[in-house]
Swiss-Prot record:
It comes from Bungarus multicinctus. This is Cytotoxin-like protein TA-BMBGT3. The keyword Signal applies. InterPro entries: Snake_3FTx, Snake_toxin-like_sf. Keywords: Disulfide bond, Secreted, Signal. CDD domains: TFP_snake_toxin.
Amino acid sequence: MKTLLLTLVVVTIICLDLGYTEMCNMCVRPYPFMSSCCPEGQDRCYKSYWVNENRKQEAYHGKYPVILERGCVTACTGPGSGSIYNLYTCCPTNRCGSSSTSG
């Protein structure tokens, strides 16, 4: 009985923590995606794209933009920040950037 009670308490604590922890998909080419909790203070997810000199996203075989990296950041400086060949965009959702989400 004590073991069952202890198990319920541990599961409750874990579930409560998951509700307040930002999860971002982490990826550096090549695959796979890896979801990870963001460090404290880094509560925004971002995606990094390869762009050409006109700041347009480069497509992979004309199908979709090449995402170079995903991760956590403290704050977003706005859409389209980054260097001339690397475009960073923040995601509006938790665990953004997977193949099943558009953000």
